[in-house]
Amino acid sequence: MMPESREYPSRPFVGVGVVVLKEEDVLLIRRGRPPRLGEWSLPGGAQSIGETVQETARREVLEETGVSIQNPEFLEVIDSIINDNDGRVKFHYTLIDYWANWESGTPQGADDAQHAEWVSFDHLEELGLWSKTIEVIQKARNLREIGSSAKYY
């Protein structure tokens, strides 16, 4: 069975993004493939069959950046729907965002990330990030400051 194309899909794809924090920096990647090719983003990617979303979060951060993370915690679910010029849905992702603190490793772009680096919170506005990305980064910072996260059972 051929995998379904991500362009013009018949159903949304599940993706996991991770806000990785280290002191006053956040780990960002420059995307190496569509959608948002060449844009700055959070590390993350598609969930594999048989994999929990927490396992996906750990794997994707490690694959794309070489960084290991501590205990990823649920942050938010976001829909990313991108239409073409005719109004047809070209991409549709259901993004499950997590946040985690850095554990080890030096960022280095790999897999489908052209580049990976720590970026100061003060410089996020300069990078042209998607507005939802900035929102989840701020939410993760706030949760880290209060030392807790929403738990779902």
What are these regions (language model features)?
Residues 97, 108-140:
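NUDIX/MutT-family hydrolases
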Residues 25-64:
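Conserved Nudix-box catalytic region and its N-terminal flanking loop in Nudix hydrolases
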Residues 18, 74, 98-100:
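A structural signal for short, well-ordered beta-strand segments
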Residues 78-106:
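Active-site-adjacent beta-strand/loop module that shapes the phosphate/pyrophosphate-binding cleft
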Residues 133-153:
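Charged phosphate-binding loop/patch that engages nucleotide di/tri-phosphates or the phosphate backbone
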Residues 1-17, 88:
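Acidic, metal-coordinating catalytic segment for phosphate/diphosphate chemistry
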Residues 68-77:
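A short coil-to-beta-strand element that immediately follows conserved catalytic motifs
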Residues 22:
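A cytosolic small-molecule/anion-sensing beta-strand core signal
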